[in-house]
Regions:
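Short secondary-structure boundary/hinge segments and terminal tails
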Residues: 53-56, 152, 203, 227-230
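PAPS-dependent sulfotransferase catalytic domain
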Residues: 103-220
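PAPS-dependent sulfotransferases, especially Golgi type II membrane carbohydrate sulfotransferases
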Residues: 1-14, 211, 215-326
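Residues that form generic nucleotide/phosphate-binding pockets
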Residues: 67-70, 74, 101, 105-109, ...
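Proline- and acidic/polar-enriched loop/turn elements at helix boundaries
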Residues: 48-49, 146, 221-224
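PAPS-dependent sulfotransferase catalytic core
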Residues: 1-99, 309, 317
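A polyampholytic, Gly/Pro-enriched intrinsically disordered region
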Residues: 67-72, 163-172, 239-248
């Protein structure tokens, strides 16, 4: 049995709220987190430094990011893994230790802030862990879901990693990061922000975000919005743009990713509300369709691990030749 844990005394802000930015990688989670900062959401003073992969910044707290990556490791996953998570793993003693550590870190680092945020692209995939952590802190939780056309996600990923950037592989990563636990968000305030719409009209999207998350706007926030729209956002931050019609034309796009994204797009454009009954009924079907692929997803992880272990080997060269023709 895990050791009984007592959290340290902290200066908790009354009515403290947290906003988690979630969504598959390459969907604009970093830009959306910077938008939250413009609205006055505290991100902490230990942010991960920009890199060539993301020169404008990740806006990820290093302490919580480190815990999240250890959770991923305890679940037997890598960044590129697509295997579905066995629900029994959420109750493991190792995750209990990390739950305690995450609670202590949040109380120590963010307990004094009335409104703070955290972003890690795989948070939604590990939502049961974070729900457990936040329930212990008593901090109210809300979400921003980053959405982006799966064709653009693959194009962006391909620039960083051609193997993960294959449309078929990117779609699988997108699905396992978004579909399994998205229905749990129905119990929280949340808003979906579409990356293309944010780039086109940042003022409107930040106003949507503020309204949905009950963030009051004052003179400071409004200046933050202007700085975000006029100084932070740059045309070069978006290298591709696909329409919704393109989803039906692309022969390699996974139909499950197409269908799930279309629901997110409807939420992002306010065609439906977050309590839309048809959304949640259909999403349950999406979960079932994805669950049926569990054996194949485990095998994909095995094959990709073999390819990465044998870079330059015969099998790796064969795959490279096959996919370079597509």
């Amino acid at each position: 049995m895990p050791t009984q844990y007592t959290s340290p005394a902290t200066i908790d802000a009354p009515g403290s709220r947290a906003i988690f930015v979630v969504g598959a990688g390459r969907s604009g989670t970093s830009t959306i987190t910077r938008a939250l900062q413009a609205l006055g959401v505290e991100l902490g003073d230990r942010l991960k430094a920009p890199t060539q992969k993301n020169p404008t910044g990740f806006f990820e707290d290093r302490d919580l990011l480190g815990i999240a990556k250890r959770v991923r490791s305890e679940l037997g996953l890598r960044a590129e893994s697509v295997a579905l998570i066995d629900p029994q793993l959420w109750g493991s003693p190792a995750l209990e230790v990390l739950t305690n550590e995450a609670e202590e870190t949040i109380r120590r680092r963010f307990g004094r802030y009335p409104l703070w945020g955290f972003k890690y692209a795989q948070t939604l995939r590990m939502l049961p862990f974070w729900e457990s952590v936040m329930a212990r802190t008593g901090i109210k939780l809300a979400f921003v879901v980053a959405a982006r056309n799966p064709l653009s996600v693959a194009r962006s990923r391909n620039k960083l990693d051609p193997l993960r950037g294959l449309q078929e592989k990117t779609d699988l990563e997108w699905l396992v990061n978004v579909v399994p636990y998205f229905r749990r968000l129905a119990g929280y305030p949340f808003v979906v922000i579409e990356y293309d719409l944010l780039m086109e009209d940042p003022h409107a999207q930040l106003m949507r975000m503020a309204a949905a998350l009950d963030i009051p706007l004052d003179a400071v926030n409004r200046r933050g919005i202007e700085e975000f729209a006029g100084e932070f956002l740059q045309p070069g931050m978006r290298h591709s743009r696909f329409s919704e019609a393109d989803l039906d034309k692309h022969p390699r796009l996974n139909p499950l990713a197409r269908d799930a994204y279309r629901w997110l797009r409807r939420l992002a454009t306010d065609q439906i509300s977050t309590d839309d009954e048809a959304l949640w009924q259909d999403w349950l079907q999406l979960e079932s369709r994805l669950a049926e692929k569990a054996p194949a997803l485990r095998h994909v992880d095995y094959l990709e691990a073999e390819v990465r272990r044998n870079r330059g080997g015969a099998f790796s060269r064969l795959l490279t030749r096959l996919f370079s023709r597509r």
